[in-house]
């Protein structure tokens, strides 16, 4: 009986520490911008999963490589303007009724791991909209307390905060200048 009790105690302790480790490195960002256009007009631009290059200044090109329209499971290939690196992302959920999409990183050069992003367009009245863009991820070297240069929390946060802020500003400009 003592052997079983020891086994259960070890299993509980091991599980608890694994769960604590899994949550320890999560980083979150949230950005929002108000746009002088109805939500449906904003969604027509922002909700085109394969067309992010039309409004994101950091994206040189983007194309769907799996599925030819906005649907769950679609894969897009992005080419970054700054350094020409490629990133592949997958559309996890696409809800045009609520003007919401969720996507994740699949492959390529990225400065975070376990990346998941959600973009939502909301009507706020008087022909205006609010776009909310949130991301959840971990720094690249999440398993160590001493990550190499460029793989720490600050590097991941700086890169993705910059991408979201410039992306939202680009979306506002693209929609309002139509």
Regions found by a protein language model. Name each.
Residues 130, 137-178:
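A conserved amphipathic terminal alpha-helix motif
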Residues 8-11, 20:
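Cleavable N-terminal signal peptides
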Residues 54, 63-111, 122, 166, ...:
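Glycine-rich portal/gate segments that line the openings of hydrophobic small-molecule binding cavities
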Residues 25, 111-118:
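Amphipathic hydrophobic-ligand
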Residues 38-39, 45-48, 87, 156, ...:
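Stable alpha-helical elements in mature extracytoplasmic
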Residues 1-9:
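Bacterial N-terminal signal peptides that target proteins for export
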Residues 20-68:
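Hydrophobic ligand-binding cavity/cleft-lining segments
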Residues 15-17:
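N-terminal signal peptide c-region/cleavage motif recognized by signal peptidases
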